[in-house]
């Protein structure tokens, strides 16, 4: 019977294939906290006095991000706030919103719930009933980023923290490479910034934590999380890439780490030759940064017969 490598506790909750480490709940929590703190320190994700807005869906990744970053708030290093987006998916979104509200109240932080309906005059359920929609994920990603960035400015946030984990990041690296999206590759990483003052820098504290460990961390700490999957989730190229990586990881446990470590070494060269797209103008309707007359949000809304509710 295995015992905790760190303290000898026989109640082991995980054995890491990549290192052979067996850990009890307490030592596992400490190891994840330490790994995230190392990422924050090495990548300079937080500065003293920062106001950080967490994109809080109520799912495991965002709840764990909030929980770990809150330790910096408790030490008076940063100020913390959160935004939760209600896409308007009946029978699914309400639970996640309620969980997010509960966590924000528990920590006593500023929190806003912003809906697609209030911002755009139409929610995702209504969009999916139209005949000419582009697919749920297309709208959801673009609309969510618009709301997150705009709300960060309203909060006066210096950073936006998202719950992207190791699986997410390694998928993004491989997916963009396979599709030849080199400009997109240059905008990945633990910290992403923009030349536009209207874009708030984004940080990914969980970037080196596997998805499985994020879920186990939430369970070990007794954190309430939204477990349901989105009813609009569909098989996508990202999912295919994710499945490939998971299959490779079975025999090569360090594969996902290798993907992002290799990417981090190449990033300076990629960024130098393929800089991220800079939106030099502003959208004629909503005023958000855009290279064209209309940003993607306003373009999509125009197709749907709606416009941003300013």
Features from the language model and the residues they span:
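Short, flexible, mixed-charge glycine/proline-rich loop motifs
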Residues: 1, 13-18, 268-279, 285-290
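ATP-dependent adenylation/nucleotidyltransferase module used to activate substrates
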Residues: 3-175, 179-186, 208-221, 295
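Short, structured interface segments
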Residues: 22-31, 258-268
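Short Cys/His-rich micro-motifs in 6-15 aa windows
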Residues: 27-32, 297-309
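Short, surface-exposed amphipathic charged segments that create phosphate/polyanion-binding patches used
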Residues: 125-131, 240-244, 289
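Catalytic subdomain that performs nucleotidyl-dependent activation
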Residues: 133, 167-250, 255, 310
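Cysteine-cluster motifs in flexible loop/terminal segments that predominantly coordinate metals
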Residues: 140, 280, 284-305
């Amino acid at each position: 019977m295995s015992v905790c490598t760190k303290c000898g506790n026989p109640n082991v909750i995980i054995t890491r294939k990549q290192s052979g480490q067996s850990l009890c709940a307490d030592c596992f929590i400490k190891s994840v906290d330490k790994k995230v703190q190392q990422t924050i320190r090495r990548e300079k994700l937080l500065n003293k006095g920062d106001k950080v807005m967490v994109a809080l869906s109520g799912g495991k990744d965002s709840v764990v991000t909030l929980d770990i970053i809150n330790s910096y708030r408790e030490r008076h290093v940063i100020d913390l706030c959160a935004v939760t987006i209600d896409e308007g998916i009946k029978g699914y979104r309400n639970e996640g919103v309620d969980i997010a509200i509960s966590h924000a109240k528990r920590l006593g932080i500023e929190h806003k719930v912003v809906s697609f309906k209030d911002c755009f005059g139409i929610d995702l359920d209504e969009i999916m009933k139209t005949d000419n929609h582009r697919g749920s994920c297309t709208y959801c990603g673009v609309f969510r980023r618009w709301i997150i960035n705009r709300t960060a400015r309203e909060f006066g946030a210096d950073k936006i923290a998202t719950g992207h984990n190791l699986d997410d990041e390694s998928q993004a690296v491989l997916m963009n490479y396979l599709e030849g999206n080199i400009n997109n590759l240059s905008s990945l990483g633990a910290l992403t910034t923009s030349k536009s003052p209207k874009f708030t820098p984004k940080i990914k504290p969980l970037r080196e934590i596997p998805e499985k460990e994020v879920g186990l961390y939430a369970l070990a700490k007794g954190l309430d999380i939204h477990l349901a999957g989105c009813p609009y989730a569909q098989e996508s190229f990202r999912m295919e890439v994710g499945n490939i990586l998971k299959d490779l990881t079975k025999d090569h446990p360090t594969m996902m780490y290798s993907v992002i470590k290799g990417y981090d070494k190449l990033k300076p060269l990629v960024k130098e030759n393929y800089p991220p797209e800079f939106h030099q103008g502003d959208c004629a309707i909503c005023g958000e940064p855009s290279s064209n007359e209309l940003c993607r949000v306003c373009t999509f809304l125009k197709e749907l017969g709606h416009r941003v509710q300013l």
